[in-house]
Design a protein with these regions (language model features):
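Sequence/structural signature of beta-propeller modules
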Residues: 1-140
Length: 142
């Protein structure tokens, strides 16, 4: 099973500045650390991949998780994580760190619901966030 991370922002002006390098880094990291569970294989099949779509909405107090949506032709199981967004807040390191923490925590919640092991991820949460924020190539300049 591979894990893929992408972003979709349907609401104009409501988005986080993470780019394709961020998506690739997180996809590679999750694919290396997460193994399919028997529950996932029983529900969808061992050949299915897991997709996380990051998005944002104004007016949310906490993340909103939608899914799963199953794409049988592509053999994908997709979840969308809508993060809280506030246009009045600067996209500084604190804001981005909070968004990443909420995103990763939501992903871990989904993985745990699917009986996938997340101990390595949970233990490395701060280091993963620091790695992303420390690499300017993963964040588009405003």
């Amino acid at each position: 099973m591979s894990v893929h991370v992408s972003q979709i922002y349907p609401e104009a002006g409501v988005s986080y500045p993470f780019n394709h390098r961020f998506q690739k880094y997180l996809s590679d990291l999750l694919s290396a650390k997460v193994r399919t569970s028997q529950k996932f294989a029983d529900l969808y099949g061992p050949e299915y991949d897991l997709i996380f779509r990051m998005s944002a909405k104004e007016g949310l107090a906490r993340p909103e998780i939608k899914g799963p949506t199953v794409f049988k032709r592509d053999k994908d199981v997709e979840y969308t994580v809508f993060l809280p967004f506030d246009r009045s807040v600067d996209m500084d390191a604190n804001t981005l760190s909070r968004a990443l923490d909420l995103l990763l925590s939501s992903m871990i919640e989904i993985l745990e619901e699917l009986d996938m092991t997340t101990t390595g991820l949970s233990a490395e949460l701060s280091a993963i966030i620091d790695r992303i924020l420390g690499d300017a190539k993963m964040i588009d300049a405003s």
